[in-house]
């Protein structure tokens, strides 16, 4: 015979005596002598010498009188230390971690009841066993690109479940089926969903057996935003990737309106206070598939060496600070290149029109006019606004073919051969100076995809990297170094392109790797670090796997206002003056 359960009064109907409240406070105070201690409510209920309904009422009363129940199941002292942390994504819910922001500490796992997504900033409370999530501070990413995972047989139900495309977001989003438009193909389409603003921070997870795992997954209430694209379709995948990584494809109406008001060609008023260089035979040298041309070069020989002019598209003439064009460009930061298409930083009227140094038309530029001696040293430079007229849209393939004396290349470059030979001679001394200062020069291969007419990938090939590429690279280095020196001389705040020395731990790892191949090196401190690494790179050019190991030893280059030099290029100061059409910094 089963035991009959006694009926309990609702908590709101329980009458508490002052003695019971005092006794409960005494018990809790004893548990919280250490301000960092967190008492479990269920344990507190068990410790009360009274009926469970009374004990639950006492716990509620304590919450109202100063002791916080911040984590639903816990009591914390109101003065308990707090901090913040950021949730890191993972493939499985149990692998998600929190990285503390405002306190020292390593990553730690989340509590099973915390409902979080990667990127969430959470409040942390310190307990006797360490920091624990206590609440949501902010959720920077509410929108997720998802695919439907509800079984086909169950799609007639009221709710649909979706899983983010990202492999590092082990969550599920639940949407009312009536919110999803009928034209959305739940089998093939990726959609964008937004997590509800009132989604609870603490909630019970559900087991998602169809993931092939016995783990419990977090479910968030969400709303349908839009259809993104068809999965496994070339154009659809580009749209999906853009949405997944926050790449805006469409420009705002205000930006398009501002672009539309710009002239179709350079007008006479724009030429005021500009140097007229239209008589100089500037050329652009780019890849065959390039569509925007933001730099042009011209070189002439001098008694001491060469005069190099690098003309960069003057985007700032058309994109003024504070305009919608400027705000959209800031938001995008760069153009984003897909294998067969590009999402531009600027509207096409600018990126492929007014700001592109197309052949046969006048274009506004900012010119770096530099003198280089026969040791490859820049002895003088100046910057000024100018107007140029490109005399040729050349490709790396054609230029290299011409410089090798091949008939096809010579016919393609035509009368520009003289300028190209001068550029090549200048490149020779710049390349020698590069070796002299022990700049690091990795020989890496770049692969490119081959596409069918319908956008499907049909193969891959290795991009050729020849001296025509290197001519332009060295010319851009000259201009960028001059830009950095100019900013320093004028005491102007700017973003430098900086690259720090490798960390000692990574150098030690590299020593161990190379030792396995019978290669050793000795360091005497920072003074011989670059020469040693440069020689290692030279000695392993025929061993790509070792080149990769050396490359992974390097720190990542970044932009910052504090100049620390560029270790890889061995420059005391370096900035990016070039590529303004596709790069905002």
Task: Locate the predicted segments by residue.
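Charge-lined substrate channels and their catalytic hotspots, especially those that engage the 3′ end
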Residues: 2-309, 316-361, 393, 398-401
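Electropositive polyanion-binding surfaces
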Residues: 9-12, 198, 207-213, 230, ...
